[in-house]
Amino acid sequence: MAAHISNAASDATNGPQKTFDISALPKSNNFTRKLPPDEEYPTPATSHAAERKLLGPRLVKNAAYTFVRPDAMKSSELVGVSKAALRDLAIDPTTIDSEDFKRTVSGEKIITLPDEDGTPEDTAVYPWAQCYGGYQFGQWAGQLGDGRAISLFETTNPSTGERYEIQLKGAGKTPYSRFADGRAVVRSSIREFVVSEALHALHIPTTRALSLTLGPEEKVRREMMEPGAIVARFAQSWLRIGTFDLARSRGDRVLIRKLADYVGEEVFPGWESLPAKPPSYDEAAVVDLPRGVPKDDVQGSAENEENRYTRLYREIVRRNAKMVAHWQAYAFTNGVLNTDNTSIYGLSIDFGPFAFLDNFDPNYTPNHDDHMLRYCYKNQPSIIWWNLVRLAEAFGELIGAGARCDDKKFVEDGVEKDFVDELVKRAENLIEKTGEEYRAVFMAEYKRLMTARLGLRQSKQSDFDELYSELLDTLEAFELDFNHTFRKLSSINTDEIDTDEKRKEVAGIFFHHEGLSKTVGSEADARARIAKWLEKWRGRVLEDWSDSANAHEERVTAMKSVNPNFIPRSWILDELIDRVEKKGEREILDRIMEMTLAPFNDSWGWDSAEEERLCGDVPRYQRAMQCSCSS
């Protein structure tokens, strides 16, 4: 199995760190210790003693989770492990062939129990599934929850201090499975395994994937019978907006407060870590906010009175604004941005019909069920804000309470009649202002990323219209590839485009191999428009850099470090799935993961022709592919 670890890592480390085999990994269960359990199975022992089939679908109230053990597949084969994930979790890569590792990530062993046949103690670290709800395509869907994902334990990397929750997706039924079977199929599991690590390698906030285990004998019914699989994945938190949605829909203000306190104290590094009230909502003013406000301090007065819950909401909003800015800058489309798929921590989460754009098309959606284009590329920033407003509805009482959020009567009895108008007015005002902050943070982050992708050292006010918008309009008009454009731009020397004739000649490198589509106009028009844009870009490059050879080399290096050579596009993932699932190949998964974990490389040293094919032009009839939510 050691061959199935990529030799690439996504980030540099500061020397060696202490690593562990999975059994010795430091483990905790803050989530289950500090939040209320399912009353039907309130302890690990009660759940462990129950027949596995009794732990299936039902309504769960007044709880954040249910204790439930994985339901192992009939047989398993560990086919992929991310070295970057091993490093970040402090797992010794030489131990992945051990039975402990393989049986843990396949759901066959509860690694936290010394005796699986015995009775676990009440304080034992025992697997659980989270309870949440959500708005799906804008409509309330009721109780959802981890219908096939089961968290095993939390672990803190001793070198970084980062805590992660490790979870198995496809590990069997839970009380939140509804009408589903608790399983995941190979095709969706391969897609999630690859894209989780791809986004991380591109520095896009995301949940992660540790391993991929196939279940050759596990037959799962979807549109047809398919083999099953389990992805071991991890994140700083798996809490979603939908976690709060469900409590709000049930009027459970006690659980909302418990969840909010847990996020402020456990998910983030404490109340003092949260961002203070901004001096204004201009882009420049919101980029870096001071932190360190004491937990009980209230900033502002009257309808602008901000307590710690407002600061908590601000942190969640800012993280999601930055996340979606990364999506837009790298043309990643999630495909299903329901509130149960929107992270409190600001992570890309729950990968279904996702895709990276090929040709730039702002109306593209990778989800063939999204007929109204609700979740298309251009709508992602507004949809994330729509979801955050749903979170604000859950937080509204806590935000609106201002300085009275800890008053005994408010905490125990709720909002008194004579306080309602003041509370509502304050909440509406602060949520509206946080919306302004969301837009400002998004734009500031988007401009920062696009400035870097264009090889500029600083952003000018005119860049947005003259460079960013004009480039995107040109790509859309002539059906050109988004990410390839930036990579090709990276290597252009300003001397190569110092005349209009040269610029028109260079413009051809952005065309597809087959040339321009007949529906987009003439090649001469395309060359002229691209040349005009290149002239503006060249001028800005020379403003920020000198025209020396050294400056050119520095700029090329800087641009190649942010403009990927390889992205796991839909056509590549489809081919990968076919070769792994249908043809039984294994090496190709290793190769794709090597490229995925080092996407900015010029080459990876295995097969130059194959690397060129995978990094090159997308086959004409495999552009803008769509898929379903079925997984």
Predicted features by range, described:
Residues 71, 75-79, 83-294, 345-347, ...:
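Conserved ATP-binding subdomain of kinase catalytic cores across diverse folds
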Residues 56-59, 170-171, 298, 363:
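Short, flexible segments with low predicted structural confidence
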Residues 189, 219-224, 228-334, 347-473:
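ATP-dependent phospho-/nucleotidyl transfer catalytic cores
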Residues 204, 332, 584-585:
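Residue-level recognition of short, well-ordered coil/turn positions
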Residues 2-130, 380-631:
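Regulatory N- and C-terminal appendages and interdomain linkers associated
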Residues 67-68, 175-182, 298-310, 369-377, ...:
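Glycine- and acidic
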Residues 335-344:
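Hydrophobic residue at the +6 position relative to the catalytic HRD Asp in the kinase catalytic loop
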